[in-house]
Amino acid sequence: MYLKISRNAKGRASLSICEKYRDPITRKPKDRIIRSLGFADTYDHLYDDPIAHFRDVVKQMNEEQKHVSSLSVLIDMDEALVPDSSDLKNVGYGFIKRIYKALEIDKFWKGVAKKEKTNIDLEKIFSLLVFMRIIRPGSKKDTYEHRDMLFESFEDIKLDDVYRALDYYTKYDAEFQVWLYDHSAPLYKRNIRTTYFDCTNYYYDISKPDIDELDEDGNVLKKRYRKYGPEKNHRKDPIIEMGLLIDADAIPLSYGLFPGNESEKVNMLPIIKKAKSRFGLERTIVVADRGLNTSDNIFYLNGNNKKENNPRDGYVYGQSIRGADKEFKKWCIDPEGYQNDKITDGCDTIIFRHKSRIYPKTIHVNVDKDTDHPKKKEITVDQKQMVYYSQKYAEKQALERQRAIQRAEDLIRHPKKYDKVSAKGASGYVKNIAFNKETGEVIDLNLKLDVEKIEEESKYDGYYSIVTSELNMSDIEIRKIYKGLSRIEETFRITKSELDTRPIHVTTNEHIESHFTTCFAAITLLRLLEISLGNKYPAPQIIESLRQFNCVNISSNIYRMTYTNEILKQCGALHDIDTGKKHRTKEEIRRILKY
C-alpha cells in the first residue's frame, strides 16, 4: 500500500491510501483505493504535517499486514454452538461477483431503482438471486432463508421485497440483456459472426396447466406459459419453452419464452429478430439442429440466396435424411462423389468421408400468415448440401434401433404391459398399433413388427447431412461449425442439473420471466468465468469449486479457509489472490468480494 496525493486545479492536495493490483481482463497493473482520506488541509488542526502523518499510517498498515501471519488466537473451549445457525460462509461467489462488477450490473439495477423511485434494493436482491443460483440453487423462499451462507450480509432484505422485486426484473429484462452484451463485448470480444439457436423446456410440479386470459368473445388477451407439451424427459407435467441464442464462444446472447404447447419451429425467427434489433447485430450465420430446419426458417432468414454475396443472415441446419425426399436419399447413399480427408477431431485423427453439392431446393413457404387465409408459396432457393458417413455413428444407430426392436417385439407379445408413454420409441416399429384416447393403453389389433420400415431405416445408418446458405463454405468448415451446437446443449444441461432452473416455483408470467432473467445472468457470468480461465475447466467443476470455497470464523477478525484446488488457484491468479492461504482477516476476504 502507498499514499496517493492528487492535486486539483487550485493546488489542494487530496489523499487516499491505495494498493497495486493486476487487472483480471487486460492483465495490466492498476491501482485501487483502499481508503479515501479527503483533502490534506482538513487535517491541519490535528497534525503538523498531515501528509507525513498518513505516510507513517500507511507504513504501519504495511507492517501489520506483514505480521498478521503470526497472530495468536484465544479460543474459548466452553463456547456453545448457536442452534440452527452455521459459521460456514461461502467466499467462492466472489469470483462471479468480480465479473458482475466489471459488467456494472450493480449500476444497472441501481439506475432502475432510482428511475422507478422504489425503496426496494433491486440491486442487492438481484445479486443475491444470481449468486445463490450458482452457489445454492433453490426457490426464492429457499434462497431468502439461506442468504446467510454468503459472507456478505443480506440480512436487511425482506422476503416480501424479493417477490416485489421480480416485477421490476421482468419489466427491464430486454434492457438488461442489451446491457450484458454491451458491457461484455469490449472485455471479452464477443464473436457474433456465428450464432447458435436451440430450444428446451422446463417443467412445473403442478397438476393442471394454466388457462389463457380471454375476452368476452373468446379471443386470447394474454397467453399463459405453463401448458402441456412434449417435455424432453417425457414427464406429464406442464412445461414452459425457452429459445436460447448464444454466440460462437457459447456466451448467451438472448433468449425468449413461449407457452409449452407451442412449436419451437415458429418461435426461432422472432427471437433472432428481436436480438438483432436490440443489439444492432449485422449479418450472422444461425446454426440450429434439424428440428428447426423448416421452409420458413430457411426463406425468412436467408431469402432465395440467388445473389453472389447475399447480405441477409445465413444458416447452417441439420438435415434429416430418412425424412427427406427420394432424390435426396438416393444422392446421400450413392457412393459416387465421396472423398476421404484426415481431420483432427478433439484429440483424435479421423477419416472424414464426405461429399457436397450446390442444389436448387424447392420449398413451400407460408405467406399471409397473419391473415384469416394463410397459404403456401413454392420457392426455389440455392443451398449447399453436405453429407458425411461415420462408421461409429452407423454402429450407434444400429444398436439404438435394435434395442427399440427388442422392446417392440415385447410390446407385440405383451401389449398390456405398455401405454402410449412407455411404448414411445418401440411403437414406431409396430404395425396396426393404436392407443386408447382416455387411458393411453395399447389396443390389441393384430400387432406386427414393421420389417419394411426397419430395412428402409438401416440403409441410412451412419449418414448425416448438414445444409447451409453459405455456398462457398468448405465441407470441413460446415461440420466444424455445426459441431458447435453441442455447446448450447451443454448450456441447457448446466441450467437444469447444476443451476436447478427447474422445477419452477413462481406462478405468474411476470415472476416466471424474472426467474429466467436471474438464471440467464447466472449462466452468462459463469460462461465468462469459464472463458477467463482459458476454457480449461468444464462448468460443473468450476461451480463445485466455487461452492467449496468457504471459510469459518475462528475469532472476531480471523477466518479459516476450508478448501482449495487448482481451479480456485487459477481463479485467484486472475486477481492476484492466493487461494491456498489458510487464514485470512475479514478485510482480506472483503477485498476478494470487492465490498
Q: Whereabouts are the PLM-identified features?
A:
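Anion-binding and metal-coordination hotspots
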Residues: 3-9, 13-15, 24-26, 103-595
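Conserved glycine(s) in the ABC-transporter nucleotide-binding domain "signature"
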Residues: 1-123
